[in-house]
Amino acid sequence: VTEQRWNLVADIGGTNARFAALREGQLESEFEFYHSVEEYPQFSDLIIKLRDEIALATGFVGAPHSVCLAVACPADVEHISFTNSHWEFTKTHLLEWFDCQELVVINDFEAVAHGITELGADDCIKIGGGEPQAHKPVGILGAGTGLGMAALISHSDGYHVLDTEGGHADFAPVGQRQMDVLTCLRQNFKRVSLERVLSGKGIVNIYNAICQMEGTDPTLTTPPDVVTAALANSNPQALTALDTFCESMGAAAGNLALTLGARGGIYIAGGVVPRFSEFFVNSGFREKFEDKGRFASYLEPIPVYLVTRNNLGLLGAAKKLQNN
């Protein structure tokens, strides 16, 4: 049994809650814990179970010294309410529940951005472009239960993370098929944000729209169903849907690169795209990324990296504590 200071980091999305118990100063841990959000009516129910789990697995005694939670919703408020799940809590309650000395709550994509700074060459697949320019902005977007966006801005002390809610900007269709998809989605949603298209659920939304456009009944109901059918080439609507997803991601990534002047590169993170990374690399993603008329030549040299490393959010949350 070790009487040493330890920290707890978490990456809490709409579907999964991931935790790691770290010795102080560590960025990575062999002690990781995974839970499904829907299994727990309240976050506090999970904390009770987590305490026992951590004590049993690690031998760490007592409360964590520092806790960093990366959450899939705006984090700079006292009352945390998740965009894509039923969980909510206050920072005051968190301090009570964890009994920690330091509590940091950040947006999940701010954590991803911190994690990007620790990636090695083996953690990414490069999709076109040249070399990243030093000290230029880096754009990050990633599809999971929702769509996250963030940026890394270089400054004299290292870098600053710009966390955003860019995933809730309007979906801007490119080409007739995307316009038709938007028309279909408008029948179901008062407003169609990027997240309605570029997320796990977004893949199903696109698939349902394609079925409606082609006059066929949708038979697939979950993101893995659609992806599996597309990769097996067993369902033409699923294949069209995944193509449309990749092209829409390319257009959105190109828009982000233009908006930020992201000559330091664009990173595609999140849990969705790595499930079909080979398909994504060979899709129309890069073509749509560069397809910006007079500014195609601006985008051509910008590299895009598909992040293949697991648990980037946990790494980033640990990095945030280290930076503090």
Where are these regions (language model features)?
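ATP-dependent carbohydrate kinase catalytic cores
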Residues: E102-Q133, P224-P236, D243-C246, A251
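Glycine-rich phosphate-binding loop of actin/hexokinase-like ATP-binding domains
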Residues: K126-L194, E278, G284-E290, R294-A296
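ATP-binding/phosphotransfer module of carbohydrate and carboxylate kinases, centering on a glycine-rich
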Residues: V1-A55, G59, A63, D180-N324
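Active-site nucleophile and cofactor-binding loops and adjacent substrate-binding regions
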Residues: V37, F82-S85, V104-A111, G130-Q133, ...
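Short beta-strand-loop/turn "lid" adjacent to the catalytic site in phosphate-handling enzymes
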Residues: A57-V105, A113-D123, I140, R275-E278
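Short glycine-aspartate micro-motif
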Residues: N7-D11, S66-C68, V104, V138-G142, ...
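Short amphipathic alpha-helical segments
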Residues: A21-L22, I48, I80-F82, T117-E118, ...
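Short, acidic Gly/Pro/Ser/Thr-rich loop/turn segments
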Residues: A17, P74-D76, G146-A150, N205, ...
